[in-house]
Amino acid sequence: EGQDVLFFWRGEKKGQPLSKALVDDPVATCKALGEKLGEIATMAMQKSSSANEERVWNDRLKKMEDRLKTNTLWRASHSPETRGTLTLRHLRPEHIRVVEGGIILGGIWGGLESVLLEMSQKRPAISDLGAAFTLVHEFCPQNQRQEALRTLGESWVSEAPESISSRRALDGHRGGLHIWVYETMLNRMMMARAMDEEETRFVDRWLAQVSTIQAAMFQARSWSALALMCFSASVLVPLAWLWGYMSWAQMVQVPAFLGAGFLLHRMYRARAPSPW
């Protein structure tokens, strides 16, 4: 249909594998990897950008949860800025090498994994970043992991289009990046079972934290609900006065409700999960 785009990779076996680089120098490696993925996202979005397919992406999560019986359930109300595009799909360590501080990608294509995992054609560029985060969780030493994750995310933002890397696009209340890390963890588990391989413990450890992440998101939404109630009350009070149910003196409640609403909304925003 005239929409095919080919990526050509320099795939020589130079430098060191990503898995080793993430152990030796995780922060510098994550900076280079984030910048590379951001550049790819920019090129991909210039060539292809489709509307948000929230239902398709969430339906796929449900299928994997049902098949894997993970005892987890997570859906995201993706922001309008989350758009489908061309992605790398399977960001595995054997596909990535680090050469003189730069990143070389090789051997990345759909193939068997695309069939087994039933991935949709157009996926958000942030899904590649989620896959990269999974690699950091797998290989990076724990004492440097948080800094490495932050560096990876910030370097991706520095190169990716602003439309898909803005604060709104990364809003943790809507799933942000975390939902794509979750998806990648399910992908890894499904491929391990399909190939009769031993499942990696880091996937189990991360999935065990899902309920904690969701609980924090629920608590934050409680503040949002309270803010909405205050804003609604600030509208209802003047209406009640117009209909004769309240006196003029009681109108002092309006600024009080408005002030409380703004304060609670700020608390809600402040409690948003870190993008990284």
Describe these PLM feature segments.
Residues 175-179, 224-228, 249-252:
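Alpha-helical transmembrane segments of integral membrane proteins
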Residues 229-274:
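Transmembrane alpha-helical hairpins and terminal membrane-anchor modules
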